[in-house]
Every structure is written in structure tokens, then in C-alpha cells.
């Protein structure tokens, strides 16, 4: 999976992975569409768009929910997140009525497979696609609740009317979501994008990370204060864990970065210091 980290909001040519001080602009690492279907056979994993809302009679009058996730590994764990905004491009708006499009935090992991659909009806799911019933199609990993397991709390909402670019402004809940994912990356399951699920033809289509025009991809902007360097984190992964213990033991008796008390050699005192700061 590919994602990009941009140095500014000005996109010139192809998007590359770089960083800017205390701000990053990231394109998704995965996105997809949950398509309401009693058999759970449809998905849009590799399509250039995803959907949120309810389709019309010709589409079965069923619900669509977007799924979007961003790789936040460029932010050092325990950095302080201060602002989070999401920009998405609505490329088809149906009846062009104003509809609320909300972000809700997923509580379980999900997949993006190779299914390609040319409309909101989706295509037959491919291995590891999410579907209405499956988190990873072709496996036994199912949603507890058909249609996705996500929070009832709205992290952010934005009225979307016609086609164009829309920004979901920073909220305390968006900040809290990203902060939790930065501190514990294994819990980063992204957001469910939820529209008006009552009114027929309320569905909105958003361009995905697979869209051919780079500037139309979704982008997450995160502003943060980097965590101060931790001398116990010898491997610089943001945690004091087994990798750091291995590094310390590998330099035992020598003058190295693991000599925390500057005694001239790594010894039991340094081992005790590392274990006292253990984060796992």
C-alpha cells in the first residue's frame, strides 16, 4: 500500500514522501466501501472512489459507508497532537442536497483488496476486501455488527452538497483519535465515513487514494509537537522495549549509547534504568 507525506498544502507534480517540521499531510494507506448486502459479497477495494449514504431504488435502496485509514508512523509515538483536519473531494453528489457526512472511529481492523467497481453497486469482493459482513473477505474475520464495528461518537461532521473539495475541521475528538493511534499504532483502524442513511439518493461519492489525479486524493493534515528524545529508546522507535534491551545487552561492558549513567561501560545500573522506563 502506498501513502504520501507532503511538506506543504501546495501539490506540485507527483506526490512524494517527505516531512515538514511539526506538520504532516498524508494520503490514505487504505480505503474502501461497505456495501449493504445480505450475503456480504461486494466491495470497492481498488476503485478510484468510495461512497457514503443511501442509494436510490435502481441501486437497491441500500446503504454505503466509506472506510479510510492513514499511516501515522512518521509521527513519533507520544508526540502531542494539536490539530487534525481531513480534506476529501466529492466527485459525484447525486441529488445535490446538503447531507451530513460524519467520521466515526473504527474499533476493528479491515482490509482493502483488488476489487474494482465502476459504480456504487460494487464488484465481487476479492481476498482481504472488507464487505458488509467480513472484515477480510475469504477469512473467518467478520464484523460483530454487519456494516462495520465503529464508535457511536461522531469524531467530525461536514455538510456536503455538490461536487467539490471539502474539509472536516479539527475537533477535540479527531485529535483524540489520532493521538490514540500515534501512541498505540496497532489500534489504528481509521474512520468509517457515514452519510444520510435514511433518504434515498442521498449518497455522496468521494475520490479515493487510487484516483489518477493526485490532488483529488483524500489528505489528512496533522499538526503536532514532537515527543522529546528518550535516551532509553536506543532503537528510536518511540518505545522502550525488547529491541532496546537487545541493543543494551549487545553492548554490555562497552562505552555506548546504552551507558545511561556515563560510568564508562554498560552495566547493571544501565540495565536497571532501561527496565524502569519500559513501555513495551
Tell where the protein language model's regions lie, with residue ranges.
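Cellulosome-associated attachment modules in secreted, modular CAZymes
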Residues: 225-280
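Beta-strand-rich interaction/scaffold domains
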Residues: 28, 93-180
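Ser/Thr/Pro-rich, low-complexity mucin-like regions
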Residues: 171-214, 223-226
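A short beta-strand element within beta-rich, extracytoplasmic domains
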Residues: 70, 80-92, 220
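Bacterial N-terminal signal peptides that target proteins for export
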Residues: 1-9
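Extended, low-complexity, turn-rich repeat/linker tracts enriched in Gly/Pro/Ser/Thr and Asp/Glu
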Residues: 78, 89-98, 199-201
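Flexible, small-residue-rich N-terminal segments that precede or flank a structured functional core
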Residues: 21-74, 111, 197-200, 210-226
Amino acid at each position: 500500500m502506498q501513502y504520501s507525506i507532503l511538506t506543504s498544502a501546495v501539490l506540485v507534480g507527483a506526490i512524494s514522501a517527505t516531512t515538514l517540521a511539526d506538520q504532516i499531510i498524508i494520503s490514505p494507506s487504505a480505503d474502501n466501501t461497505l456495501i449493504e448486502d445480505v450475503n456480504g459479497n461486494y466491495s470497492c477495494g481498488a476503485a478510484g472512489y468510495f461512497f457514503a449514504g443511501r442509494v436510490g431504488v435502481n441501486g437497491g435502496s441500500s446503504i454505503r459507508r466509506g472506510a479510510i485509514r492513514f499511516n501515522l508512523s512518521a509521527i513519533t509515538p507520544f508526540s502531542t497532537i494539536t490539530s487534525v483536519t481531513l480534506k476529501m473531494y466529492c466527485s459525484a453528489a447525486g441529488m445535490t442536497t446538503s447531507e451530513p457526512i460524519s467520521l466515526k472511529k473504527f474499533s476493528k481492523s479491515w482490509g482493502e483488496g483488488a476489487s474494482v467497481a465502476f459504480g456504487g453497486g460494487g464488484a465481487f469482493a476479492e481476498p482481504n476486501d472488507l464487505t458488509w459482513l467480513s472484515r477480510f473477505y475469504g477469512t473467518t474475520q467478520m464484523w460483530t455488527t454487519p456494516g462495520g464495528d465503529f464508535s457511536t461518537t461522531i469524531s467530525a461532521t461536514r455538510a456536503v452538497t455538490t461536487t467539490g473539495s471539502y474539509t472536516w475541521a479539527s475537533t477535540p475528538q479527531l485529535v483524540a483519535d489520532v493521538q490514540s493511534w500515534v501512541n498505540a499504532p496497532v489500534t489504528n483502524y481509521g474512520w468509517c465515513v457515514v452519510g444520510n442513511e435514511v433518504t434515498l439518493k442521498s449518497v455522496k461519492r468521494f475520490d479515493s487514494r487510487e484516483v489518477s489525479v493526485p490532488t483529488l486524493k483524500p489528505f489528512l493534515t496533522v499538526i503536532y509537537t514532537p515527543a522529546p528524545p528518550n535516551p532509553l529508546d536506543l532503537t528510536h522507535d518511540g518505545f522502550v522495549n525488547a529491541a532496546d534491551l537487545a541493543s543494551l545487552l549487545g553492548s554490555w561492558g562497552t562505552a555506548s549509547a546504552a551507558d545511561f549513567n556515563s560510568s564508562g561501560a554498560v552495566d547493571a545500573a544501565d540495565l536497571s534504568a532501561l527496565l524502569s522506563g519500559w513501555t513495551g
